[in-house]
């Protein structure tokens, strides 16, 4: 168990390092975007070398300095932002998507190692008709969650919230969901769309 914890910590640290790196890239790209936007707006109004100095300043200071410069020069007017700004915005969106994917990978890795995953409680008509009765020990569990925690059809899992109930799982196609009998929801004090912890037994 100690080895599993060490392994989990190691993988978690690696994934967090990747996320930090991607978040730094987002900050760099946002600074780059700000720089491009300012350049595009004041292109032809303020010389490039002066603009370069302005974009290095904190935002409030930059606005003051640009205003002062324009008053001194008696210039006004704006030039529309060009394609470069949109390119940088797309790059930021792409990196943010990478951050989101990396965070999901962390969750999957932890689930695989610990055999536990947070899962949303759902409802299903087929389940209600066949398995929703007092004492039923069946649950529909999303296949992605089954794979993540390492359980197969017919095996038991512990469903935890304000208590624990052991249920036999059948595969469910809706990602991230578990469907449990009404008596289980009542016992655990959960409603549809609440999260529960599902643990491999």
UniProtKB/Swiss-Prot annotation:
UniProt keyword list: Coiled coil
Domain of life, per lineage: Archaea
Coiled coil start-end: 3-43, 76-120
Record's protein name: Uncharacterized protein AF_1504
Organism: Archaeoglobus fulgidus (strain ATCC 49558 / DSM 4304 / JCM 9628 / NBRC 100126 / VC-16)
């Amino acid at each position: 168990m100690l080895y599993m914890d060490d392994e989990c910590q190691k993988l978690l640290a690696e994934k967090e390092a990747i996320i930090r790196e991607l978040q730094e890239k987002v900050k760099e790209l946002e600074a780059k975007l700000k720089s491009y936007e300012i350049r595009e707006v004041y292109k032809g109004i303020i010389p490039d070398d002066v603009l370069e100095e302005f974009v290095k300043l904190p935002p409030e200071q930059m606005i003051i300095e640009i205003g002062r410069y324009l008053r001194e020069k008696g210039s006004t007017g704006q030039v529309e932002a060009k394609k470069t700004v949109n390119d940088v915005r797309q790059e930021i969106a792409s990196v943010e998507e990478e951050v989101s994917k990396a965070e999901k990978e962390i969750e999957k890795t932890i689930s695989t190692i610990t055999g536990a995953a947070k899962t949303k409680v759902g409802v299903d008509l087929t389940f209600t008709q066949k398995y929703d009765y007092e004492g039923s020990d069946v649950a529909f569990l999303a296949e992605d969650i089954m794979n993540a925690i390492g359980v197969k059809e017919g095996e038991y899992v512990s469903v935890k919230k304000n208590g624990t109930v052991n249920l036999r799982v059948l595969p469910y196609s809706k990602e991230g969901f578990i469907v449990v009998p009404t008596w289980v929801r009542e016992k655990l004090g959960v409603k549809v769309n609440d999260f529960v912890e599902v643990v491999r037994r």
